[in-house]
Amino acid sequence: MKPRILIAIHYMHLGGAEISLIGMLQALDPNKVDIDLFVYSHEGELMKLIPEYVNVLPEIPAYKMFERPMKEVLKKGHLSVLFARMKAKMRMKSYLKKKQTIDQSAIMGFLGEEMSKVVPDINPSVEYDLAISFLTPHNFVRDHVRAKKKICWIHTDYTRIDVNAELELPVWDSFDYVASISPDVTKTFLQIFPSLTPKIIEIENILSSTFVRHRAEEFEVDWSKIGGGNCLRILSIGRFSEQKNFDNLPFICSLLIEEMKKLLSIGRFCEAKNYDSVPDITRRIIESGCNIKWYIIGFGSDESLIRQKIAEAGMQEHVIILGKKSNPYPYIKACDIYVQPSRYEGKSVTVREAQMLCKPVVVTNYPTASSQIKDGIDGVIVPMDNENCAKGLAEFILDTEKQQHIIEYLRTHDYGNVEEVEKIYSLIK
C-alpha cells in the first residue's frame, strides 16, 4: 500500500505559497504516494491547476468561514465560528495595546487557537503517513488530523513581522518537522524560535521550468491594448495612397512602443510587497529620462492605497494595475524587466519564474534578497528607499549590455528544482 499524504491550505488564489503548492503537487509521483488536499475554501484561479491524481477533499463549512466576512458567518449560522473569531479579535486588541504596536501579524495565532476549539476533525477515518500544514495557522493540522508524522511550513521572514512567540512556540514545537524555504528564512525564524533548530528541514519552493515555459506560450500579450492610455498620441490626415505611406504606420508605431520599457511586478497587494511605493519610484525614473510603464498583477487589501499613490504621483499613464490573472506567465515573457520591490520576502516564487523565462530581474535589498539573486550575474539588487531604488532601476534600464549579460546567463542555467520532492519522500520512508 502506498503512503498517504494530506496537505492543508486556505484557498488557491494567485500567490507565492499557492503557486509553490501547485509545483509540489505536480512533482509528487502518484505511483509513489496517494495525496489528499484539504482546501478550506474551494476558490481561486489555481484550483483548476490541481493535478487530476490529487484527491481534493470536500469543503467543511466551519473551515470555509475562516476568512469570510463576519456578516456572512452570522448569516450562514456559524455561531461558534463567529464567537471564536470575535474572541480572537478581542485578544488581539488587548495584545496590541500591551505591545504598543499596530502590526496585525499576530492575529493568525489567536485565530488558530480559538477556531481550533470549534472546528471538526479533517477526514477523521484516515490516519495519514504524513500531514502537511502549508500555511499558518498550523493549529488545524496539529489538532484535527491523524497522522504518523506532521510537518508545517515557513514562507516568510519572521524578523519583519510581529510574532507572539509565547503563543506560537507550542504550536510549532508540536510538529515533527518545520520546513523552511531557504537558509535565510531559516536564520530569521530561528532568531525568534531558537529551540526549534532540531526540527528544521529546508525544502525550497518546488517549481518546474517546463511547466512555467509551457504556460508562458498559451497566449501573446499586446501591450498596446492594455490600460493607461498612451504616452504619445499621433494623428495623420490624407488620402490612403502609396504616396502617404500609411501602410507603414503599424510598423512605425511598434517601434515607438518598443522604445518604452515595460516593467512588471506580480504579488498580493499588501504592505510586504511595497507596491504603494511604485508610483513614486516610477515618477523618479521618468524624471531621470527613461520612458517606462510599470504593470502590476495581483489583488489585495492595499489596492485602494496603491491607486491613491498613483493619482498623487500623477502616474496614471505609467503605473497600470492589471488585477488578477489566472495565467501571469505570458506577461512575464512579454515584459522587459521583472521587478520585486518588496519590503521583505521569504523566497520569491515569481522571481524564480521570471528567471526561468530568462527575464532580467531587479529586487530591492530586503534581508533575504542575496539568497535568491547573485547581484549582477542573474539579476540586480537595488536599494529599497524610493530615491536610490529609482536611481538603480534607471541605471539598469539604460544598461542594455548588462541586461543582455544576465539574459545569457539565465539561458544557460535551469532554475527548476523538482528534485526537492525527494525530501518529502524521505520523511515517509
Task: Say what each PLM segment does.
Residues 162-164, 190, 206-230, 241-244:
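Acidic anion/phosphate-binding donor-loop and adjacent secondary structure
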Residues 324, 343:
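Aromatic "clamp/platform" in nucleotide-sugar-dependent glycosyltransferases that forms part
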